[in-house]
A protein has these predicted regions:
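All-alpha amphipathic helical-bundle segments outside canonical DNA-binding/catalytic cores
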Residues: 82, 122-126, 141-159, 176, ...
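Hydrophobic alpha-helical connector segments
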Residues: 56, 70-101, 151-158, 200
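Amphipathic C-terminal alpha-helical segment
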Residues: 94-97, 159-177, 188-198
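Helix-turn-helix
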Residues: 6, 10, 14-52, 56
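C-terminal regulatory/oligomerization modules of transcriptional regulators
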Residues: 85-86, 90-93, 153, 169, ...
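Hydrophobic alpha-helical bundle segments that form small-molecule/ligand-binding pockets
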Residues: 116-118, 128-154, 191-203, 207
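Short, basic, alpha-helical segments at the C-terminal edge of helix-turn-helix-like DNA-binding modules
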Residues: 59-65
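Amphipathic alpha-helical segments used for helix-helix packing
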Residues: 83, 98-119
Length: 212
């Protein structure tokens, strides 16, 4: 990698860390250059505006959803359906390890900048769509859900459950709201699985067709 690309990557990494730890609006460009160990001229060369840097950070998340979010869970959990709960548990662990300071990086940014930076909104939505894609694929690979369940809708429901649970846990500075939401969510999914098993079970006394 050239020194030019290394400098650009250092700036993106610094911005990503600061946005996650203290928020987009609370992060100044001077902080980013100091955190990255670069001169301000380098920052403005790559990112003329702060929104340009925001978009670069969102691009990073989009390109690294597997390595940054899914890989750890997928490598230790083979069952596709349990991978969904493993991903959710990853957010739980982040909340606890950071004393509720960090949640979902994209969710945090949406709350801060979706109105003030509409140019970044499509990329935020793309990040959410990728998350939903991954969860939907887990549901599909599991083969455990009823055929009449819309797997895309269920994946969106998973995302909204996670985002709401993270937000409440951070607000209360307590993991209980997160756990309560996930317990109810798991119960719902397990009921769907049970329904699928019930409908697929052979009946003991099948009804004979009517004689003509």
């Amino acid at each position: 990698m050239s020194e030019t690309l290394k400098t650009r990557d250092k700036i993106i990494e610094a911005a990503r860390d600061l946005f996650l730890n203290q928020g987009y609006n609370s992060t100044g460009l001077a902080q980013i250059t100091q955190h990255a160990g670069v001169k301000s001229g380098s920052l403005y060369y790559f990112f003329p505006t702060k929104e340009d840097l925001l978009i670069a950070v969102l691009d990073f998340y989009k390109a690294n959803i597997y390595d940054g979010l899914l890989k750890f869970t997928y490598e230790r959990i083979s069952d596709p359906l349990e991978r969904v709960f493993g991903v959710l548990d990853g957010y739980r662990q982040m909340l606890l390890m950071t004393n509720f300071e960090m949640g979902c990086p994209i969710g945090n940014l949406v709350l801060e900048v979706t109105n003030s930076h509409p140019g970044a909104r499509p990329l935020m939505n793309t990040n959410f769509d990728q998350w939903v894609d991954a969860i939907e694929e887990c549901f599909r690979q599991s083969g455990k859900l009823p055929e009449n369940v819309d797997l895309r809708d269920l994946a969106v429901f998973t995302l909204t459950t996670m985002e709401g649970a993270v937000m409440l846990a951070r607000s209360y500075r307590d993991i209980a709201p997160f756990d309560q939401a996930i317990v109810q969510y798991r119960d719902y999914v397990e009921r769907l699985v049970a329904d699928a098993m019930e409908w697929s079970r052979p009946r003991a006394n099948p009804i004979s067709p009517l004689e003509p």
